């Protein structure tokens, strides 16, 4: 019970939505990461393993997407839907201040991820589904949530659309950033 039950419920929720559960590697090569984010973002966020071309993952999305590096996925195989639960490691702890973008910026944390590889013309439809699944999951855990669409100036490199999903928190008695579905 407790947190273990919450983790299991998250995983099972995504599997019930048709996602394939993956156990990602916790270290990733730079050529895989730079396929999904800019070098500047990688340098600011990720811990490099000294003497190796490896980084601790900042999110398991990169590992899941990296599985398809240098491959041609046939159109009839799409969409490919994947989910994982993993530890994440980030250098950006406290980088945004305690009240900005949530109070939970720490060096190591765990999170559930979902990734969809789809046809470009289906990308916005899948973005909407992923946002909907995110909200549905938190509400199924009796966590009050709201969403705020991000303006284009707040989007990271290589991103088209994103929204903050925030949860009600008794401390600091306001909504706090939880996750950021992105296309």
Model regions and ranges:
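Generic beta-strand/beta-sheet core signal
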Residues: 25, 57-59, 83-86, 112-117, ...
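Secondary-structure transition/capping motifs at alpha-helix termini
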Residues: 12, 16-20, 74-76, 120-121, ...
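Active-site-proximal binding-pocket segments
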Residues: 112, 117-150
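Active-site loop/lid in soluble adenylation, ligation, and acyl-transfer enzymes
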Residues: 1, 8-96
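A translation/RNA-centric and nucleic-acid-associated enzymatic feature enriched
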Residues: 70, 80, 84-104, 126, ...
């Amino acid at each position: 019970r407790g947190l273990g039950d919450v983790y299991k419920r998250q995983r099972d929720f995504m599997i019930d939505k048709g996602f394939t559960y993956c156990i990602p590697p916790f270290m990733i090569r730079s050529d895989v990461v730079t396929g999904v984010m800019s070098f500047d973002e990688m340098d600011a966020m990720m811990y490099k393993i000294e003497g190796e071309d490896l980084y601790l993952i900042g999110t398991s999305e990169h590992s899941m997407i990296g599985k398809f590096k240098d491959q041609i996925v046939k159109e009839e195989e799409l969409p490919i839907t994947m989910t994982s639960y993993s530890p994440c490691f980030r250098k950006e702890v406290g980088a945004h201040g305690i009240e900005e973008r949530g109070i939970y910026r720490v060096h190591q944390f765990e999170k559930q991820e979902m990734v969809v590889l789809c046809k470009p013309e289906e990308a916005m439809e899948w973005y909407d589904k992923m946002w909907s699944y995110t909200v549905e999951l938190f509400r199924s855990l009796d966590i009050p949530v709201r969403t705020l669409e991000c303006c284009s100036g707040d989007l990271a490199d290589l991103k088209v659309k994103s929204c903050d999903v925030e949860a009600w928190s008794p401390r600091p008695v306001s909504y706090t950033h939880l996750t950021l579905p992105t296309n």
